[in-house]
A protein has these predicted regions:
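Catalytic center-proximal scaffold of phosphoryl-transfer enzymes
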Residues: 1-150, 163
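Short, conserved catalytic/metal-binding micro-motifs enriched in Asp/Glu and His
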Residues: 154-166
Length: 166
């Protein structure tokens, strides 16, 4: 979705540049648009897990906008470009939290995955409805992945989630 959004704004910018260029030998060079700049440089604010993002409230000069901005400002810009991005991020975070809350507790994971499937199926976004179908199809292997086992590595014994792979 992010790539499609970026392509849409790049195409818009190319068309705008072509409209302004009257002489093909001297094309008009437009600066990068605000939307393309934000989507290229700060899409990680949507794609990263929120728990991994260090939000800075201290202001720093942004070279593109020529104003003082912080992480919250960039996030706000992303949401203004496309309000769906906030919903996507929030729905993604539900799955991230499901994973982090249920490590070592497959019984709780079984209950919570059903709630997650219902929430995703009710979503107005096709990608999350499709993901709900995947969760439903692979529910048992997903639940089994929350079983913790003792493993040995680097001379130490530690707990690790059971792998469904080879």
């Amino acid at each position: 979705y992010m790539r499609q959004l970026l392509k849409k704004y790049k195409q818009r910018d190319r068309e705008r540049q072509e409209q302004l260029t009257s002489d093909p030998l001297h094309p008009v060079q437009l600066p990068i648009s605000d939307e393309v700049y934000i989507l290229q440089k700060y899409r990680w604010l949507i794609l990263s897990n929120q728990s991994n993002i260090r939000y800075h409230s201290d202001l720093r000069m942004d070279q593109h906008f020529h104003v003082l901005m912080n992480t919250y400002d960039y996030e706000d810009w992303l949401f203004r470009i496309d309000s769906n991005l906030k919903d996507f991020r929030d729905l993604k975070e539900q799955y991230v939290l499901f994973n982090s809350r249920n490590g070592g507790n497959p019984i709780a994971a079984r209950t919570e995955i059903d709630e997650l499937i219902v929430a995703y199926k009710k979503s107005s976004y096709e990608m999350f409805r499709d993901f709900a179908n995947l969760l439903e199809k692979y529910k048992d292997p997903i639940i089994n992945s929350f079983i913790m086992v003792k493993k040995v590595g680097n001379g130490k014994i530690y707990d690790s989630r059971l792998s469904n792979g080879p």
